[in-house]
């Protein structure tokens, strides 16, 4: 079994769960996000692997397209804890499937050396200012990997107008 939205709830087929969610919610949504990046959900980040991601994206796009006249844009949200091969694989899957956009990034499992106090030893996703540099670098790498052909939304650690502008420039 794979675990889905919390460590207390497991599913034997995460892709089927996403498809059910898309089918039910698409007629009501302005846009939808396929989050494959929660560090707090065991096994979820495995859906970022190229083969699994392509399978998932094909399935949710088909579900969205079958949900009636309303076809909200579908975006996929990815983790910041990716190497260049993973970024390339995700970009390739996103472009090949025709997903509408990518959100970079969710929270990180990394703990920067500058982090102090209890947060330094906490498990789970780290957000806020410590995420800004990593998330912005990953956003820039996705822009290069997609040759600017895929709409990107940069999130993570934005605390000011200057931070927002840095994401735009990334």
PLM regions and their residue ranges:
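Short beta-strand/loop segments at the ligand-binding rim of alpha/beta enzyme cores
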Residues: 7, 65-82, 144-154
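Generic structural signal for well-ordered alpha-helices
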Residues: 18-26, 50-61, 87, 91-92, ...
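Conserved, mostly hydrophobic/aromatic
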Residues: 34-35, 77, 102, 142, ...
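Glycine/Thr-rich beta-alpha phosphate-binding loop at enzyme active sites
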Residues: 39-52, 92-150
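Catalytic cores of alpha/beta
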Residues: 82-96, 144-148, 158-170
């Amino acid at each position: 079994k794979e675990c889905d939205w919390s460590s207390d709830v497991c599913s034997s087929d995460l892709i089927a769960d996403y498809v059910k969610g898309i089918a039910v919610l698409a007629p009501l949504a302005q846009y939808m996000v396929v989050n494959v990046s929660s560090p707090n959900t065991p096994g979820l980040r495995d859906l970022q692997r190229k083969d699994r991601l392509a399978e998932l994206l094909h399935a949710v796009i088909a579900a969205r397209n079958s949900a009636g006249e309303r076809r909200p844009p579908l975006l996929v949200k990815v983790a910041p804890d990716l190497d260049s091969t993973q970024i390339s694989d995700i970009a390739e899957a996103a472009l090949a499937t025709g997903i509408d956009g990518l959100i970079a990034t969710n929270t990180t499992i990394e703990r920067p050396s500058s982090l102090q106090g209890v947060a330094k030893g906490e498990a789970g996703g780290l957000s806020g200012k410590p995420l800004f540099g990593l998330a912005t670098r990953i956003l820039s790498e996705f822009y290069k990997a997609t040759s600017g052909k895929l709409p990107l939304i940069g999130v993570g650690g934005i605390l000011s107008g200057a931070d927002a502008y840095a994401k735009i420039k990334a």
